[in-house]
A protein has these predicted regions:
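Conserved pre-catalytic core of RNA-dependent polymerases
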Residues: 1-129, 133, 166
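Short, conserved micro-motifs composed of acidic
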Residues: 108, 194-240
Length: 770
């Protein structure tokens, strides 16, 4: 219960701190909706904006020593009270930190308990937000918030800080940083904190030579940072490589070191995965693909938003270097040879090429930027681009037009999303959400057994009986439905009402980027109608589980404003009446008359939509980007140099298989075809690419070895011979041409490998090769 209570308090304090701007703009750690990449982007924006106009940038990195254990409890409570938190909360914090004890255990030996009533527990839910609020006092004293940003600023991620400034001279930068560093040391000392001066670092970023004809850097002498503190002189020498929050910066902003570091780290991780299995044993290929995408890709692509550009323009050398890790991982997942084309391996594993993965992550950060609050440091940096008046009229030295900007914020900014988001709306505040206020007057039942199971049939029968009883009662029953047609990009909603033994129909079109968006609109329209009509205790049947589970979730997500409107409408109704609302799941196309009728109304609503509906929503942006990436992958797949010269056209659902991005059916096709068996998948992959232990493979790569079939010495052991003519195996089909045109050739393919367990294995090799 104690941990649950601290989590509740932490969520409330995080929300209030962000909603009321209680923290310094430069604080990115321990704060909701902030990440390390935010700090990196803001810093790079400052560096690029300055150096394009001929100003050098200098950064001083600091580390607050013993941060969590050094927080003074009395000072913490005073800070919370000063910031406006309730007295009950400050009193709770004061009592929460006292009378704490801890013990140390070494094997079976346990120490006596001793007092631990100082600082904040580092793993506690409250520690990040309390420490951030406490530290903000000192930061605001040295870097006070103002409408006009200063030439010298700071960033803090928990206790890792960075002071940065820009000017025409590095010597000026050093003097300014020294003065601000001393001011910060004094401010931190006043609240009982100190900087670990031995970890202080300095780095200079060179500006462009504005007088040069080409984009060249003005490399100049790099002075050291000197200051005096506690009667001791300190000299901080500039570094050639600076690591901050996992990003590696150099004075020239060359990302080679960063990319090489994470490529090596990813390579070490993926090579260690060999302990989990190889081509004949170990975990299944589906689990391998999941592990690679969950554990290794995030490491390999960490910080890619800082340097990557769409389609890899201008950074191809970095992408090529990282592809070595991706290629090795695809071979481990599929059990194929090193000579197998990497494109074919990725298609079989259901994982796109690395260039597409980087583009998708780039898109993901674009999406994140559009959903941030207007007061977020990334949004304010972009919306209110402040340039020092001394260099405002200087023509920036930018990259050639055919190359993307050096500034990641300019690359990431997009105006394609016009949907509005409100991260800190009052209805999103923990404790003030609709289900927090009226938990017993709103009923949501999204349960249903798995479709096709015996339990589902019994459950559906009981649901139909309960609906029949409801129809004979006096309650108002509302069936809602929404639909989105991907090909035409049209969305429609409908709801039908059974009331007083008669039906009332409502339908129309709506902007939508997915079925989820349309379903949320349908629920909103139905709820609004019920409240306007003063319906008491209505019951809603909804055929979309995702919409049913989240239509009152007002967090940032697609259709957030619609969920906020639903919450506000219901809140007003519940405050002014004693009515209750019930929402239940009803599967579509299951023989429920009201649900089927709503589905027909939705199709009528589609006819009202314009020929080219507006595409302004977040879902539209994500769908369009995903489609472009799918097209890109399929264009690559048509190239023989990508998938190999001898790829076989296997079919899925009677159509020639084509890869698709974020499509489960396409991603899992080869895993399901092989039954998630690594031995079977590796044999299939070798055969479909013709990179298998056969005589044909030896002819191309090992010409000195035997190339004839062991079972048929008069014939060369080619893939066609093994599949269709070898006397050792039952044939796949009458001929390769007939198999390629067979609409169910994937089933024949699977049957062949299940019956012929040694086909395309090393067991087929002649004796002189073993």
């Amino acid at each position: 219960m104690g941990k649950l209570l601290t989590k509740v308090l932490a969520n409330r304090m995080q929300f209030d701190a962000a909603a009321y701007s209680l923290l310094h703009d430069g604080q990115c750690g321990g704060v909701r909706k902030h990440a390390t990449i935010d700090a990196g982007i803001v810093l790079l924006d400052f560096i690029n904006t300055s150096r394009e106009r001929g100003w050098h940038t200098s950064v001083c990195a600091i580390d607050v020593a013993q941060f969590f254990p050094s927080l003074n409890h009395a000072a913490v409570t005073r800070v919370l009270a000063k910031l406006g938190f309730a007295k009950t909360l400050t009193n709770l914090m004061a009592s929460y930190f006292i009378d704490r004890q801890t013990v140390y255990r070494w094997d079976s030996a346990t120490s006596d308990p001793f007092d631990f009533s100082f600082g904040t527990p580092q793993g506690d839910c409250l520690s990040p937000i309390i420490s951030a609020l406490f530290l903000s006092v000192a930061i605001k004293h040295v870097f006070p918030p103002s409408l006009t940003p200063k030439s010298t600023r700071c960033l803090f991620f928990v206790n890792d800080g960075a002071l940065y400034t820009a000017s025409p001279s590095l010597a000026t930068n050093v003097r300014v940083l020294s003065a601000h560093l001393l001011s910060l040391l004094i401010a931190l000392a006043n609240i009982g904190l100190a900087i670990e001066l031995s970890k202080t670092e300095l780095i200079h970023f060179f500006a462009f030579q504005l007088s040069a004809s080409s984009q060249s850097l003005a490399r100049t002498h790099q002075p050291s940072l000197t200051f005096r503190w506690n009667d001791e002189d300190f000299v901080i020498k500039p570094s050639n490589v600076w690591r901050y929050l996992g990003f590696f910066f150099t004075p020239t902003l060359d990302w080679t070191y960063h990319v090489h570091y994470y490529t090596n780290k990813g390579f070490s991780s993926v090579r260690a995965c060999s302990m989990l299995g190889n081509s004949i044993r170990g975990i299944g290929p589906k689990q391998r693909a999941l592990g690679y995408q969950a554990c290794i890709l995030p490491v390999l692509t960490y910080g890619s938003a800082l340097w990557h550009a769409p389609q890899g323009v201008g950074v191809i050398k970095h992408v090529k270097h990282m592809e070595r890790v991706h290629s090795f991982a695809m071979g481990w997942i599929t059990g194929t040879f090193r000579t197998t084309p990497i494109g074919a391996r990725g298609v079989i594993a259901g994982i796109p090429p690395l260039c597409i993965i980087l583009d998708l992550r780039f898109c993901g950060y674009q999406v994140r930027l559009t959903t941030l609050d207007d007061r977020h440091i990334c949004r304010t940096t972009w919306s209110h681009r402040w340039i020092n008046p001394r260099i405002r009229d200087v023509r920036p030295r930018t990259r050639p037009r055919h190359l993307p900007s050096d500034n990641p914020l300019e690359r990431l900014a997009t105006d394609a999303v016009r949907e509005q988001f409100f991260p800190f709306h009052a209805s999103s505040r923990p404790g003030d959400r609709l289900l927090d206020l009226f938990p017993h007057r709103i009923s949501i039942d999204a349960y249903s057994p798995k479709k096709g199971s015996t339990l589902f049939k019994a459950w559906l029968s009981d649901l139909a009986k309960s609906i029949t009883l409801l129809h004979s009662s006096t309650r108002t029953i509302i069936y809602s439905d929404g639909a989105y047609w991907n090909k035409t990009a049209r969305g429609a909603y409908s709801f039908t009402v059974f009331r007083d033994n008669r039906w009332q129909d409502f339908f129309g079109w709506c902007p939508a980027g997915s079925s989820f968006d349309a379903e949320i609109v349908a629920i909103e329209e139905a709820v609004q109608w019920a409240c306007i009509q003063n319906i008491n205790d209505p019951i809603f049947f909804i055929n979309n589980k995702a919409a049913l589970s989240s239509f009152l979730d007002t967090r940032v997500r697609p259709s957030q404003m619609a969920t906020i409107r639903i919450s506000e409408i219901l809140k007003d109704r519940l405050i002014n009446s004693r009515s209750s609302f019930s929402f239940r799941y009803c599967p579509s196309h299951s023989g429920i008359d009201g649900n089927d009728h709503a589905d027909r109304l939705t199709k009528r609503g589609t006819a009202l939509a314009p020929v080219t509906p507006p595409r302004l929503l977040l879902s539209d942006f994500i769908n369009d980007y995903t489609k472009r990436m799918t097209i890109h992958w399929r264009v690559l797949f048509t190239s023989r140099s990508f998938k190999g010269q001898q790829w076989l056209p296997i079919r899925r659902q009677k159509k020639v298989f084509k890869p698709a991005v974020r499509n489960k059916a396409s991603t899992n096709f080869f895993f399901e075809l092989s039954g998630n068996d690594i031995v079977l998948l590796s044999r299939m992959a070798r055969a479909i690419t013709n990179h298998a232990p056969t005589g044909d493979y030896r002819r191309r790569f090992l010409p000195d070895l035997e190339q004839h079939c062991p079972a048929c010495p008069q014939h060369a052991q080619t893939r066609t011979h093994v599949l269709f003519h070898c006397s050792r195996y039952s044939p796949l089909h009458t001929s390769l041409t007939n198999w390629c045109h067979d609409r169910n050739n994937s089933k024949l393919w699977k049957t062949f490998f299940q019956r012929n367990t040694t086909a395309f294995t090393f067991g087929d090799l002649p004796d002189d090769v073993h």
